[in-house]
Design a protein with these regions (language model features):
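Loop/turn elements at helix/coil->beta-strand transitions in domains of secreted/extracellular proteins
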Residues: 79-81, 144-147, 230-235, 260-266, ...
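Active-site glycine-centered loops adjacent to acidic/histidine catalytic or metal-binding residues
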Residues: 152, 298, 365
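Subtilisin-like serine protease catalytic core
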Residues: 134-247, 275, 287, 316-318, ...
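C-terminal subdomain of the subtilisin-like protease fold in secreted/lumenal serine endopeptidases
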Residues: 226, 259-270, 277-282, 289-291, ...
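Inhibitory N-terminal propeptides of secreted protease zymogens
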Residues: 17-107, 135, 263-265, 389
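Gram-negative bacterial Sec-dependent N-terminal signal peptides
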Residues: 1-17
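Protease zymogen maturation seam
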Residues: 77-147, 155-165, 250, 410-417, ...
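Extracellular S/T/G-rich loop segment that most often corresponds to the catalytic His/Ser-adjacent loop
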Residues: 291, 309-382, 386, 390-394, ...
Length: 426
């Protein structure tokens, strides 16, 4: 994949290279429409689709055999603000393939680390190196008014540990099947939307998204596992296919949808590709709407300060980046880090959570740390719903625990949900 290429108003388009077949993301300047771009009718353009997002005029353009001269002309068109090649995003968890049918809270060291329950590759952990869930639960277990988007591979919204905490679009649930009853442009979006397949059913055929949802909001029902929040409304937004892959256009439409349905926070356990102005624009639009964007730091053992990864490295006030630590309170070997760019660490090694079909499974990755941190932030929002995204990020950093290990990889250390909420009460 190529670097982002912007139009003449920003940077040169010289690096936009012709390819036998490629997909472009085009943003038009205000006041222009697709009819204003003559090259959209070029014989090399196979398809032009309006992405219909609320933060600008964006189009997905599929080309075949477009030559360098035509690409240059497209970038220099006075109607176009910028052109970039579509990026590919993926999920990359490390999966324990043995599904656990009869899970227990005692196995969730990320919520309560006894030192003996970390499992996996670590025979022993260190007691207390967790997110301090039991401490915060004495103060709050969340509120149904807090709405969190799980932007991922979808969610098994029928899972017995998740169903009661899934958002329900009542107008669609009580409406006519096949009709856009609420007039939001999305048909039958009862629990969210599937942008990978363009339909109203965000069911998860992969497992990653359901695992993330369980970390945020699995019910405290004396069965299965627990999430950080017992009271929450989760919106299932699927832009990653059942193979775990997605594209820029679906990512930005997912973020825009989350803004439209009024979420408070987005959990994003995905990454890949290079810098995308379109994706940055969508995250900025979420920030403008007062929505927190929690992002996984990445699983390539890299220093994000020196080698950016996206979407984690977008410099917007609402972006909170989460690295992963293990049961000993040390950086998970796979986790990215960054003193300036990774804001906090959370449990991410051998994390037990929900997967489709009323089952449970352990996975590892910053993908797991991200929703655990998102759940803790959701508890803070339950206490203080009027904080700005930047105020929330500042509090996450200020209340983190310096355990003597993680401070070399992040501003302070690991997330502590009790300190985060108690600090607000004080």
């Amino acid at each position: 994949m190529k670097n982002l290429i912007l139009g003449a108003a920003l940077i040169s388009s010289a690096a936009l290279s012709a390819a036998p077949s490629q997909k472009l993301i085009v943003k038009l300047k205000p006041g222009y429409s697709a009819k204003s771009v003559s090259l959209f009718s070029n014989k090399s353009v196979q398809d032009v689709r309006d992405l219909k997002v609320s933060f600008g005029a964006f189009y997905s353009v599929k080309t075949s055999g477009m030559n360098q001269k035509s690409l240059q002309a497209l970038s220099n068109d006075p109607a176009i603000e910028y052109v970039e090649e579509s990026q590919v995003f993926t999920v990359t968890p490390i999966v324990n393939k043995e599904a656990i049918q009869d899970a227990r809270f005692e196995d969730q060291w990320g919520l309560k680390n006894t030192g003996n329950n970390v499992g996996g590759w670590w025979s022993r952990g260190k007691a207390g190196e967790d997110i301090n869930a039991e401490g915060v639960w004495k103060m709050t277990r969340g509120r149904k008014e807090v709405k969190i988007a799980v932007i991922d591979t979808g969610v098994d919204y029928t899972h017995k540990d998740l169903a009661a905490n899934m958002w329900v679009n009542e107008l669609e649930a009580n409406g006519v099947e096949g009709v856009d009853d609420d007039g939001n442009g999305y048909v039958d979006d009862i629990h969210g939307y599937d942008f990978a397949n363009d339909d109203g059913d965000p069911a998860d055929g992969h497992g990653h998204g359901t695992h993330c949802a369980g970390n945020i909001g699995a019910l405290h029902n004396r069965s299965g596992v627990r999430g950080v929040m017992n009271n929450v409304k989760m919106v299932g937004i699927k832009f990653l296919s059942d193979s775990g892959r997605g594209e820029t256009e679906h990512a930005i439409k997912s973020i825009d949808y989350a803004v439209k349905v009024g979420v408070n926070l987005m959990s994003n356990s995905w990454g890949g590709g290079k810098f995308s102005q379109a994706l940055l624009d969508s995250i900025q639009a979420a920030n403008d709407a007062g929505i927190v964007f929690v992002a996984a730091a990445g699983n390539s053992r890299a220093d994000n300060d020196a080698k950016p990864t996206y979407p984690a490295n977008y410099e917007v006030d609402n972006v909170i980046v989460v690295g992963a630590h293990d049961g000993k309170g040390e950086r998970s070997g796979f986790s990215n880090y960054g003193k300036k760019t990774v804001h906090v660490f959370a449990p991410g090694s051998n994390i037990l959570s929900t997967v489709p079909g009323d089952r449970y499974q352990s996975m590892s990755g910053t993908s797991m740390a991200c929703p655990l941190a998102a759940g803790a932030i959701g508890l803070l929002m339950s206490e203080s719903p009027n904080l700005t995204p930047k105020e929330i990020r500042d509090r996450v950093i200020a209340t983190a625990v310096d355990n003597g290990e993680l401070g070399q990889y992040t501003p302070v250390g690991r997330m502590d949900a009790e300190r985060l909420v108690k600090n607000e009460r004080n």
